[in-house]
């Protein structure tokens, strides 16, 4: 039995994970969202990245990214010292949003927009079923209108070394 787009997304770990990157693929049709999923270490003392996933939203007609950071925090976070984590630490950890952490917390995470008027309009225009989602993080909100989603585990974490081992050729991920 084939899963619907909504079912595929409901069974995946986007919420309470880290969005590490998102962008259109090199061929500009599809939109990729990379997510790292944390897990507790087996001894319960600390955590590691259990896995990394690529969510490829195919035939993406809308990709809208807006800030989730308030204007007040933006004003406090203007300095370039905040775009590099080590530079921020060396500067005495000044107040502001530390852009340099390199990820956004996916909370509340992904929400499927049931009955989306925008997706319905695109479905009618393209004569293909389209869907709309919103991914909310502490840094950005990502709204996508797309046809399907392909979910691939691209790296597996090791709790002993806390390193991620690639499962696919990362140089070819834009085309696979």
Protein language model regions, located:
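Surface-exposed, interaction-prone regions used to assemble/regulate multi-protein complexes
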Residues: 1-176
């Amino acid at each position: 039995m084939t899963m619907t787009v909504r079912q595929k997304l409901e069974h995946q770990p986007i919420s309470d994970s880290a969005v590490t990157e998102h962008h259109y693929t090199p061929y500009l049709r599809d939109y990729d969202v990379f997510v790292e999923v944390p897990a507790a270490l087996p001894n319960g003392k600390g955590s590691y990245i259990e896995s990394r996933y690529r969510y490829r939203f195919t035939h993406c007609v809308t990709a809208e990214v807006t800030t989730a950071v308030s204007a007040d925090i933006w004003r406090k976070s203007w300095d370039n010292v905040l775009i590099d984590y080590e530079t921020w630490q060396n500067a005495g950890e000044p107040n502001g949003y530390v852009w340099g952490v390199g990820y956004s917390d996916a909370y509340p995470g992904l929400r499927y927009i049931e009955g989306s008027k925008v997706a319905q309009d695109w479905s009618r225009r393209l004569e293909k079923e389209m869907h709309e989602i919103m991914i909310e993080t502490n840094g950005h909100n990502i709204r996508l209108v797309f046809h399907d989603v392909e979910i691939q585990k691209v790296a597996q974490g090791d709790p002993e070394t806390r390193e991620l081992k690639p499962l696919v050729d990362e140089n070819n991920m834009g085309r696979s």
